[in-house]
Amino acid sequence: MPKREDIKKVLLIGSGPITIGQAAEFDFSGSQACRSLKEEGVQVVLVNSNPATIMTDPEMADSVYIEPLDARIIEKIIEKERPDGIIAGIGGQTGLNITSELAEMGVFEKYGVQILGTPVEAIKNTEDRELFKETMLSIGEKVPLSRAVHSLKEAEEVVEELGLPLIIRPAYTLGGAGGGIARTKEELLEITERGLRRSRINQVLIEESVLGWAEVEYEVMRDANDTCIVICNMENIDPMGVHTGESAVVAPSQTLSDEEHQMLRSASIKIIRALKIEGGCNIQYALKEGDYRIVEVNPRVSRSSALASKATGYPIARVTAKIAIGMTLDEIVNSVTKSTPASFEPALDYVITKIPRWPFDKFTTADKTLTTAMKSTGEIMAIGRTIEESLLKAFKSLDIDNQLGIKRWDEPEIKTLLKTPTSERLFVIFHALERGMSIKEIAELTSINPFFISKMKKIVEMEKCIRTEELTPEFLREVKRMGFPDSRLAELTGKTREQISDFRHEEGILATFKMVDTCAAEFEAATPYYYSTYEDTCETNSTDKKKILILGAGPIRIGQGIEFDYCTVHAVTALREEGIETHIINNNPETVSTDFDTSDKLFFEPLTMEYVMNVIERERPDGVLVQFGGQTSVNLALPLKKELKRRTDLNTVILGTDPEDMDLAEDREKFYLLMQELGIPQPEGGYATSQQEAIEVAKRIGFPVLVRPSYVLGGRAMEIVYDEIDLERYMKEAVRVSPEHPILIDDFLEAACEIDVDAVCDQIDVLIGAIMEHIEEAGVHSGDSACVIPPQSLSKEVLDQVRDYTRKIALGLRVKGLINIQMAEKGGKVFVLEANPRSSRTIPFVSKAVGIPLAKIAAKVIAGHSLKDLGYTDEPKPKHVSIKEVLLPFDKLPGADPVLGPEMKSTGEVMGVDYDFGRAYYKAELAADNLLPLTGKVFLSIRNADKPELVEAARKLQAAGLELMGTRGTVNYLAQHGIFMDTVKKVHDGSPNVIDMMRRDEVDLIINTPTSKMSRKDGYRIRRAAVDFKVPYITTIQAAVAAADAIETMKKGQDLTIKSINEYHKEMEQKEE
């Protein structure tokens, strides 16, 4: 069936900000779908609230709307754009939920929009837990015994019926949010209450436990002709009871018998046919000794399908988009081989391993247990010829300190950790094996298949041999084939990494590269996508063209999000436009940078010195770019420069800003001297190598001070310290100080306004992309603060000072490419806090706000163009207001305190655009799932220092018709200023207090700013309850003032502007002409 001619224009809904359970995989699938539809001549209208994505680039679709993913707003876009159809399954859970909501509102009927691909019925039959169970039973498939409940009373009845433990799964939620495993009746009621609040239709499924069964997934594809294929099957190393997004996964499945595989394959095809899903779909099974249960079906592109795409090279989202407009699998060409149709099932001749990356280094109080609800922020994937090689490369890719053999646990601890899955479980298994625990005992405690544990045991045994035996050339070849990195061999043999590497080269033991080609080398592949191993034949052919290698950003984690992948992709595009052959090395399966056709060659490898050098030795690029991949690639800059210098046989150089100059910016002492030389003020500061020294420095500067370790990303272990006792606690708990690793102590500028600048420098001119004014005060990590372009309250003098300092610093650091500078303004004086000569997390937001692609311009500057040649020297002047707001993951992390400070906690971001601050801020809050109420009750409990600023905001809220109430201190203070409101008890004064009111849905907004450590407990309980009961909350006084402005603007009855980002950019061009 050829493409439908009646579908000329299609609406795609993106997945919004990155959050736990929904990361970059939807940007990767969304941008693939956009390109796929445009190839077929279809007009694309895209809506997404997340500016840090490639899919929201103005050239990705015909019209790009960066607007809140809210049904009412999307209805307005439909009214304006009049699309013929909508594709729901590309935007993850968000896309599905909004499509279902729009269908229920009757929007599609009203405007004649067809749902393409998977029909709404199929979405209902998979997302509504009760309907799903009925559908499966009707086709004779087995599901766990279960009951759907809508109240706590019904939940109690289920215990009598099914016994404990029980698994709770809310309907229409993401990453298992709100669900969990209940081992007692109390846990059941607590999780059910949370789940009912999360579910869009207030429904929770309680099912019998299949804990400990194996979890297997099948990725299946179907077209309108009813042709079905299985793309990939994957096996979770962790058993049932751990969400698949939290589990280590291997593909293809390793422990299934051929009989089991055929049984599940047939079931998968039967299920996708029964549900009438068109496009890609993911089916999860619980399997035990030939018996199985269907756990769930995702009728959409998912995290697992992104993994399956990268594992097989089969572009699932691209094919799904073509099926949605009526094409069939035999008409679609496999874009990797360019010769076989998409109806050929992929074949693998390698093993992939995926391991999640968790944010527990940021949330020390959060519960680290892994359950059926997701907590990880990202993941890595590694490819090897054997499972051992694949596992060892995966560990190396995680970019965490806890490599094998570093952490030690004692016997009782080991048993507990094996029994209860945590993020450290795989490392614990290795440790248990080292201590001589048997495979059988570990398998019994963990319910992990003995096959996987025996493979880990092989690694442990090989380590013992490496420690005791001489490293002969034959033995070295054997351990390299197994996947041991040089750095680990150096640790085990007491040599240096360089010695191992040199010995390897002398003996001619070099990495070879194999190709991922979807067909186990049966057909010729046209898109080069490689992984390294130690075999004899190498499948990559080097060319004589000018080549540049770009280092990617690795797994998504707090502090290093999708923004750096965005910068990487832009750099690749810019260099390819210049005719330069561009290669990428990265290990994140969720991103656009690891898509098969982003670069000329993709190397799926760990981002460490050895693996980067392997690629350089084989391909001999002219240069390497390290400034686009965030801290991961910046950390490699200096060591890589040294290594390239040491290797006289290589002519590769590091391009862009010199690593020595990058280091100058990171090294506080050197940077301080440069600032003095340039005559630029900094907050008073110092550094300490002992506790005594720290107290002396802090006393000299005067409390409060900002303390942090040197060299960090996303402000790890950063704190504002108010007195000596607090400082002593920080020194004991947070950091280990030594002469090599001093701690930095700075004067904390209270109530200062923080400013961020992104710029490009070619060593002659400096292009300022934008000056951003932060809404939260200095002291909240810049990655967690909302910010606005253009600045709203800074004077012309301050802005001129900011521009002057930016130029001086960029030229003083000899920057070639991007630079981000953070400053603070207090009393009209500007201080420089820090400068980072690399890509920053605000680059995508700035590029979308002002309409110029900064990362692309930077890459062209590095390739040799001047800013004058490129025609970019003037700072753009937007006529609209753009606000970046962040998305915080507290609702997915029970126990973590939702308060902002100098340590970064957000996972993603959204953008609000309109013609004034009020409307833009309202949109940004709506997009960040923190809807500002226009009617109802507001609860205020504010620390003393913030009370003067509250008066004006409280007046505006009252004038807008909202009812105010608060704790005694706040009520009395406002009464002195003529604002009267009700008093509510503090939490520790007993009931009825604000938490009781939240439980009864009697509060519409919480404004609570944290005080000193002592009475924080009350505040913590209020803020935590706000998250758990889904009440919008604000924890800084500046955000409260901004919210009051936004509510005031909205109450004046002004409509929100609905315009595409393309239209806003066009207006800027017209004004400039």
From Swiss-Prot:
Its EC number is 6.3.4.16, 6.3.5.5. InterPro entries: ATP-grasp (IPR011761), CarbamoylP_synth_lsu (IPR006275), CarbamoylP_synth_lsu_oligo (IPR005480), CarbamoylP_synth_lsu_oligo_sf (IPR036897), CbamoylP_synth_lsu-like_ATP-bd (IPR005479), CbamoylP_synth_lsu_CPSase_dom (IPR005483), MGS-like_dom (IPR011607), MGS-like_dom_sf (IPR036914). Residues 133-325, 672-863 form the ATP-grasp domain. Residues 541-931 are annotated as: Carbamoyl phosphate synthetic domain. Pfam families: CPSase_L_D2, CPSase_L_D3, MGS. Mn(2+) 2 binds at E296, N298. Keywords: Amino-acid biosynthesis, Arginine biosynthesis, ATP-binding, Ligase, Magnesium, Manganese, Metal-binding, Nucleotide-binding, Pyrimidine biosynthesis, Repeat. Transmembrane segments: none annotated. PROSITE patterns: ATP_GRASP, CPSASE_1, CPSASE_2, MGS. Residues 930-1071 form the MGS-like domain. This is Carbamoyl phosphate synthase large chain. It comes from Methanosarcina mazei (strain ATCC BAA-159 / DSM 3647 / Goe1 / Go1 / JCM 11833 / OCM 88) (Methanosarcina frisia). The gene is carB.
